[in-house]
A protein has these predicted regions:
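Hydrophobic helical h-region of N-terminal Sec-dependent signal peptides
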Residues: 9-13
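Disulfide-stabilized, aromatic/cysteine-rich ligand-recognition loop
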Residues: 21-24, 103-104, 108-111, 122, ...
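Active-site microenvironments of metalloenzymes and redox enzymes
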Residues: 48-145, 254-258
Length: 258
């Protein structure tokens, strides 16, 4: 009888955990967005997908490294992260004052972020998925005042990163119900280096880099006024998979229904 009760309790807890996980994601409907750069002009179609409501927090990442010792600060292989990996944590299993439990985890490499998402049966969002979600306004699929919306984002990009970071849910939720896509941390995407791949395939291998950093003067830009997008592309193009950056976090995604 006790064994049956224990099994039932375990099943109930597992179901509750699954419900919490489900509530932690929102469905982004299929749609399109206009990328700042690409070989083909116009909008890019993005299939429906699910995205975490918030960036992954220090508390969530602590649970991950407790369960997966090889991803702890003192044990991670140099191949998968540089020396900045979780450098602001007090100890391997003690985030400390600079990394509050509800603040977004940062100083994690792309390898670590990808592995964390896989451990949750999720994945990192693609760049197109992230940009599709991030293009939404607060009350509508597109901002009511695009210029003011872009200015607000750019103002955040201009602010220096100070630790400890605020808790997730600090900035604003967009039309899809996703928080903190702007205003808290930069975020890893699965194909973060796609801009570099595109640039390398051109006759002028340095052309893309110059476009990314020349902002409104860039040739081939979909929107010369969207400086914030230029900064995101430049950040992605200058980052390597093992880099751990103080203001770079991540959130997870998974395939959705059409």
């Amino acid at each position: 009888m006790r064994r049956l009760a224990a099994i039932a309790l375990g099943a109930a807890l597992q179901a509750a955990a699954s419900a919490v996980a489900a509530e932690g994601m929102v469905q982004i409907p299929a749609g399109d967005y206009r990328p700042q750069y690409g070989s083909e002009p116009g909008a890019v179609a993005v299939d429906a997908f699910e995205l975490d409501v918030h960036p992954v927090s220090n508390g969530e990442y602590l649970a991950f490294v407790m369960a997966h010792p090889k991803w702890r600060r003192g044990q991670i292989a140099p191949l998968f992260a540089d020396e900045a990996y979780l450098s602001h944590w007090q100890e391997d299993l003690v985030p400390g004052a600079l990394a509050p439990a509800h603040a977004p985890v940062t100083n994690v490499s792309w390898f670590a972020a990808r592995t964390y998402c896989a451990s949750q049966d999720k994945r990192l969002p693609t760049m197109d998925e992230w940009e599709r979600a991030a293009a939404a306004g607060i009350d509508a699929p597109e901002p009511a005042n695009p210029a003011a919306f872009k200015r607000r984002i750019l103002d955040w990009y201009a602010e220096p990163t100070r630790l400890p970071l605020p808790a997730v849910g600090h900035s604003f939720a967009n039309h899809f119900g996703v928080w903190d896509l702007h205003g808290l941390v930069w975020e890893w995407v699965s194909d973060f280096n796609a801009t570099m791949t595109t640039g390398a395939s051109r006759k002028d291998a340095g052309g893309l880099d110059r476009q990314l950093f020349c902002a409104a003067g860039a040739v081939g830009s979909a929107d010369p006024g969207d400086y914030a997008a230029f900064m995101r592309y430049a950040m992605r193009g200058s980052t390597k998979a093992r880099h751990a950056v103080q203001n770079m976090g991540f959130r997870c995604a998974r395939d959705g229904t059409r």
